[in-house]
Design a protein with these regions (language model features):
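Short secondary-structure transition hinges
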Residues: 104-145, 169, 173-181
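Helix-turn-helix
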Residues: 23, 27, 31-65, 69
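N-terminal hydrophobic signal/anchor transmembrane helix of membrane proteins
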Residues: 78, 86-89, 95-105, 186-202
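Amphipathic alpha-helical packing segments from all-alpha helical-bundle domains
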Residues: 123-159, 185-196
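N-terminal intrinsically disordered/low-complexity leader segments
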Residues: 1-19, 202
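Hydrophobic alpha-helical connector segments
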Residues: 83-112, 123, 150, 157-160
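Amphipathic C-terminal alpha-helical segment
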Residues: 162-180, 196-202
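Amphipathic alpha-helical linker/stalk segments
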Residues: 72-97, 127-130, 134-144
Length: 202
């Protein structure tokens, strides 16, 4: 009586997954959470998926294409999260909730957040690759209750994003650890001062 080698029935779970653009991008997001932005390559992701690097080119054109797709997904995640946490809240309460969620996302997903910092938001002929007003919509909706017109609310939303992003980057690069300041209190006070000044901009 003969028996088949044990390896005959082994299957790589990742290989059993049917690959398409979505599964490749989802795998890249998980990879970023675990290994970080700099470690993401076509070959490294292929190993993660139990396949060969060239096979991924059936689903993404290049590493740059994959990174742009990943960044788009990260932006969708962040905007969706901001809509969720601001739902049912108004004015400063909504702004504080969004700011806290934004900072938390960056801390919990530093690899994904790097997608916002490591690539330009312009294409090869300097055209924007994102719809900035659509991305700012959660903030502009919360800010709009202060009676600001659409353009002023948008500009204020960009200022809020700049403040949050700048603070997060100081934390992620270790700057905040080197000064005698409670980062939680400092962040909350920064956002509070921003919200308090909105009524004066009408």
């Amino acid at each position: 009586m003969t028996t088949e080698p044990a390896t005959a029935h082994r299957r790589n779970p990742a290989r059993a997954t049917r690959l398409n653009r979505d599964t490749v991008v989802n795998a890249a997001l998980s990879f970023l959470d675990r290994a970080g932005w700099d470690a993401l390559t076509i070959n490294a992701l292929a190993v993660e998926l139990g396949t060969k690097g060239p096979s991924l080119y059936n689903h993404v054109d290049s590493l740059d294409d994959l990174r742009h797709e990943v960044r788009g997904r990260v932006l969708v995640e962040i905007v969706g999260m901001l809509h969720t946490v601001s739902s049912g809240r108004t004015s400063e309460d909504a702004i504080l909730a969004m700011a806290g969620a934004y900072r938390s996302y960056a801390h919990h997903h530093p690899g994904r957040y790097a997608a916002l910092t490591r690539m330009p938001f312009l294409d090869d002929v300097n055209r924007p690759t994102i719809d900035a007003r659509e991305l700012a919509k959660p903030a502009t909706e919360a800010i709009g209750v202060y009676g600001l017109d659409e353009d002023t609310a948008f500009h204020a939303g960009v200022e809020l994003w700049a403040a949050m992003h700048g603070f997060v980057m100081l934390e992620m690069t270790g700057f905040m650890a080197g000064i005698e300041m409670d980062p939680d209190i400092a962040f909350t006070e920064m956002v509070h001062r921003f919200a308090s000044g909105l009524a004066e901009r009408r």
